[in-house]
Design a protein with these regions (language model features):
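Membrane-interface "cap" regions at the ends of multi-pass membrane proteins
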Residues: 2-68, 180-183, 196
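Membrane-water interface regions at transmembrane-helix termini and the short interhelical loops
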Residues: 2-4, 75-77, 100-103, 154-159, ...
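Hydrophobic alpha-helical segments and their helix-loop junctions in multi-pass secondary transporters
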Residues: 26-33, 101, 141, 145-149, ...
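Membrane-interface helix-loop-helix modules in multi-pass membrane proteins
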Residues: 42-112, 251-263, 270-272, 276-316, ...
């Protein structure tokens, strides 16, 4: 057991080092494009469709969706929780880009605004609005960042039980700071693009690993196996877990979709992506790309969470719902071999990518606000 854990840790560390070197290299490469304040904060407003779309999508989804939301709602609601991911794609991405992107880009160009506080100052001709917006952004994005750190720490401490969560937080913070300081928004956007690709690969790896688990039974039997889950004392049965509209939780499901979809419309780290798009044509492309990206990540994460009861034999792990996804993955992958270890390393990099992309956007938005 100890040898298997050592093998997993070794492969994971190698993957982390490679990932860190790529992120730093992007930061160094981007440094030459950040000679002005406009270049540092917005990449000179010349960011293309694919990079803008991935930057938006990766900022939308952090490790919180995988470790927190997908684990909690997948465990309690079942397959109906997938609608949260679908709703995020439709309302949080497609509708947001259709209604906000072009208007926001046009107004910020006209007002020459580089940040949300500057936009409020120019739009309403009020310095007080700028100060108020800056305070709100700086104060309330701090606890948001802590939630991202917590989500990532839960997964890494499962693989490295002797390393404290604080140590992982420090590593993430330092690595994010390096490429952010070096390359500003350009570095953030291009690392987001790379991290987005990693997230897509990681989600597919998660889905395959979970579905292949004997308790799940593959794509042909997962539904019938989930329907046979009995009440373990929490009053949740297979009928609830296989309801495509959330069963008794349909009201909660609707509210959650609205909160997690429309709540992002005003987040500065999301809105700033519209500022930097190079032209209207790129906005049209980015609208489609970001929607597809969100659909893959959101639906994939909640699908994995909805099958967690099968993998874990309907027993909530120690640590509660935050431990559902980490334990589901470790159980589904089984005894470590080189293949499963590499898959686990990819998934860990997925979570790291999801967190760092969100954190870099939050930090840049908070710093630029003041």
């Amino acid at each position: 057991m100890e040898q298997n854990l050592h093998q997993t840790q070794t492969v994971t560390v190698i993957a982390l080092i490679i990932f860190a070197l790529i992120m730093i290299a992007i930061g160094i490469f981007s440094a030459r494009k950040t000679k002005t304040m406009d270049g540092f904060l917005l990449g000179g407003r010349k960011i293309g469709a694919w990079v803008s779309a991935f930057a938006y999508g990766t900022s939308y989804f952090s490790a919180v969706i995988f470790v927190g939301y997908a684990g909690q709602h997948g465990w309690n609601i079942g397959l109906g929780s997938i609608w949260i991911g679908i709703g995020n794609a439709i309302f949080g991405c497609l509708l947001a880009w259709m209604l906000l992107a072009k208007r926001t880009r046009t107004m910020t160009h006209t007002l020459k605004s580089k940040t949300m506080p500057e936009f409020f100052e120019g739009r309403f001709n009020s310095t007080k609005m700028k100060v108020f917006a800056a305070i709100i952004i700086f104060v309330f994005l701090v606890p948001y960042s802590s939630a991202v750190y917590k989500g990532l720490g839960s997964m890494f401490t499962t693989i490295f039980p002797t390393v404290s969560v604080n140590t992982w937080m420090l590593v993430i913070a330092v690595l994010t700071a390096i490429y952010l300081v070096l390359g500003g928004y350009v570095a953030t956007a291009y690392t987001d693009f790379v991290q987005g690709i990693i997230m897509i690969v990681g989600v597919f790896a998660m889905v395959v690993a979970i579905v292949k688990n004997p308790n799940v039974g593959g794509f042909s039997h997962f539904f019938s196996n989930l329907a046979s889950v009995a009440d373990n004392g929490d009053k949740i049965t297979g009928a609830q877990l296989t309801s495509w509209y959330g069963g008794a939780n349909w009201k909660f499901l609707c509210v959650n979709i609205l909160l997690t979809s429309f709540g992002t419309w005003g987040l500065p780290q999301m809105v700033s992506k519209y500022y930097a798009v190079k032209d209207i044509k790129s906005i049209h492309k980015a609208t489609v790309i970001s929607t597809v990206f969100a659909l893959i990540i959101g639906a994939g994460a909640y699908f994995v969470g909805s099958l967690s009861r099968l993998v874990l034999n309907n027993q909530l792990p120690e640590g509660g719902v935050d431990a559902v996804i980490p334990n589901t993955l470790l159980t589904a992958l089984g005894d470590p071999n080189i293949v499963t270890t590499i898959i686990l390393a990819v998934i860990l990099i997925l979570l790291l990518s999801a967190s760092m992309s969100t954190l870099s956007s939050i930090v840049l938005s908070s710093a630029s606000a003041i």
